[in-house]
Amino acid sequence: MDIQAAEISAILKQQIKDFGAEAQVSEIGQVLSVGDGIARVYGLDNVEAGEMVEFPGGVRGMALNLEEDNVGVVIFGSDRNIKEGDTVKRTGAIVDIPVGKGLLGRVVDPLGNPLDGKGPIEGVERRRVDVKAPGIIPRKSVHEPMQTGLKAIDALIPIGRGQRELIIGDRQTGKTAIAIDAILNQKPLNQGDDENQKLYCIYVAIGQKRSTVAQIAKTLEENGALEYTIIVAATASDPAPLQFLAPFAGCTLGEYFRDNAMHGLVVYDDLSKQAVAYRQMSLLLRRPPGREAYPGDVFYLHSRLLERAAKLNDENGNGSLTALPIIETQANDVSAYIPTNVISITDGQIFLETDLFYQGVRPAVNVGLSVSRVGSSAQIKAMKQVAGKIKGELAQYREMAAFAQFGSDLDAATQRLLNRGARLTELLKQGQFSPLKVEEQVVVIYAGVNGYLDKLPVADVGRYEQDLLRNIRSSHPGILDAIRSEKQISADTEAKLKSAVENFSKAFA
């Protein structure tokens, strides 16, 4: 075998020419200490705030404290297998999650990993979890209604698309029930063909029991609402960093719809638990505590989250993101730190009371303390026409009821006012998972404010309402169609409605 020098040199030249110097360079650090879901890492000198880092075994973390000689990292997962001296790798990416319509009908964790066993998530793009809220110029005032299907809310405390309305109350007062009803009520809109009317929902469960989240998913599925809903779950057994991240992940999912000329609704259930998780992380990272041991930036935590809910103007696609944050109070104390913070950030609050709940007023909305700072611009004209009176009458009723306890000899006008108020309060009661269409609410409230209930015993009001709606649906569907299409009660419609309600009231017994 003879060796050909020319051939060998040609091969060597080719190999030298083809030599690739694309070595993967990733900056690494070392774990100094680890415990309670926090790792102190030495050596990641160029790491960015909020950047994802990777520990051995694929566990991820997020760099939060950038100090002179070390980096404080919160760990998204178990820290059991991480030990001192382990290498930590920078990923170069700020925390992001998959977003898009491919997530509808799914249950995911705050990093976008599926939890429902329905396979991988298809057809999505990735977005950063913590982004800046839209400025003042791209926004528009809130003017389209976001119907919850609950008479007490749609008539008295209307919510508009792009609004942030806080649901606040003690434990077991029906806060989640209101939010779930609002999601269920979007079913007719989402089954229609009008993309401008559809409202995609995101339910964020923070620090709740897994059984509760499973129950909510089952309720949504049984009512046909899961197909337009995404559930983001960071349950009680998940580490604090995931509970802290969950609302931001849910908001990012909603922003996809807002920025693509669609409409989103995001429910944060509840932000008290997010604040507790953030407090835990901050104290373990040795950040100085403030009032109630919360860190100084806990206000900014919630404000930067809730400011991302917005109604965008025509140049930006006219999309919207509505937020329903939930806060749990202790013994009706609305003046605690987190409740006052969130009340001051949101555009109104729905205040639920234990006493009302146990008196059988459900939803247990305290109409006196609840407000919507968007007001009637978030109502259709028909609802404004009937709901204007009910607000005034209920306010007078509450005032009179307080005095009426002391005196038995009341004049006829006061007695009439008390009777009407008691019946209107009864009229606003509603069962769970039974939202009403807005035109049906208008008919019912019309009957209430025009005195058709005044002669009835209070106990019969619920039956009257159901029978009236049944009668109108079967015998006078034109009235409901007119209110739905015209969005107001014209003189012609009012005449028909008046005669229909009068005839029904005479026959009702």
Swiss-Prot record:
Q: Where is it mainly found?
A: membrane
- Record CDD domains: ATP-synt_F1_alpha_C, ATP-synt_F1_alpha_N, F1-ATPase_alpha_CD
Q: Where does ATP bind?
A: 169-176
Q: Which GO terms describe its cellular component?
A: plasma membrane; proton-transporting ATP synthase complex
Q: Which family does it belong to?
A: Belongs to the ATPase alpha/beta chains family.
Assembly: F-type ATPases have 2 components, CF(1) - the catalytic core - and CF(0) - the membrane proton channel. CF(1) has five subunits: alpha(3), beta(3), gamma(1), delta(1), epsilon(1). CF(0) has three main subunits: a(1), b(2) and c(9-12). The alpha and beta chains form an alternating ring which encloses part of the gamma chain. CF(1) is attached to CF(0) by a central stalk formed by the gamma and epsilon chains, while a peripheral stalk is formed by the delta and b chains.
Q: What is this protein called?
A: ATP synthase subunit alpha
Record the organism.
Parvibaculum lavamentivorans (strain DS-1 / DSM 13023 / NCIMB 13966)
